[in-house]
Each structure stands twice: as C-alpha cells, then as structure tokens.
Amino acid sequence: MLRVVLLFGAALTAPLRAQEAPPKKVAASVERLFGRGTRVDTIAVDDRRVLRIARGDSLLGFAQVRNVIGRDQPITFLVAIDPANRLKDVDVLVYREPYGGEVAYDTWRKQFRGKGADAPLEIGKDIRSISGATISSRSVTLGVRQALSELTAWHEQGKLK
C-alpha cells in the first residue's frame, strides 16, 4: 500500500513535461493576433522560449506558449502581450480534455485582453469561471497570470527587446 501511495505522490509532484504545440497552430495564432507580414524571432530567457513579434522595425509584442494541467490532461495555450505589457490575447492551441473546451471560446478569452501584471486575474474577481469547466478555467487563468508576470518582468528588466 505504501508503495502505491509513494508512486501516486510522485506522479502529483513530478514536473509536467513540455507539450509542444504544432508549429502551424502557433503561426496561425500569431498571424490572427498580430496580422500578416510579421517577423517572429525566438528568444531564450531563463530557460524559456519567448517569441518576439515585429513588423519591419516596429515591435508588436511578445508571446509565449505555455502548458497547464486541466482536469487530467495538459492544456497548451499562447499568451501574447503588446509592447506596453498589456495582454493582447490568450489563444488555446491544444485542448486535450473531453469536456471544458469552452476555455478556447472567444467569449471567455476576451476578458483577459488589455489586462496588465497588476490585475488580479482571479476567478471570481476579474475573470468569470465556466460552469462545467471550472478546473480548466482556473488552470488557464493561473497559467496566464504566471506568463504575464514573467513576460512583464523580463521586458522591464531588458531581457526582452
């Protein structure tokens, strides 16, 4: 019995292996958020990959692909910010759960737009939960808050240019 508990406990604390988003989905998301004709460069910051999006000499913003665990499966999403460190949008790239896919709907995602790192980004405060997708909505909200915080800090520290 102890062995089962130890194995189960290890599964809960093991780090989530990075789930890759299909490159075509990332490219389509960047185009939808920033328009056509953008240049996307990948920057390594603190062992993470950040996308720098520009058109010509103009910086349009930054984006990062992240993963959170929904009820049982990873949810892969892209968080994009503008040069003023405001959330441009959140785009769910891969949703693997059988239920709760409403986190990918624009009607839910649009409540993140324009928020800064100073916003609470908490279910029940400035973000609505989704009935039937409570775990997914909480997980994505937490992941967005963490990504926004990191992207903003890196940008303010000059690690993103």
Tell me the role of every PLM-derived stretch:
Residues 1-7:
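Sec-dependent signal peptide recognition
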Residues 9-18:
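Hydrophobic h-region of N-terminal signal peptides that target proteins for export
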Residues 18-138, 142-161:
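Flexible, solvent-exposed loop/hinge segments and secondary-structure transition points
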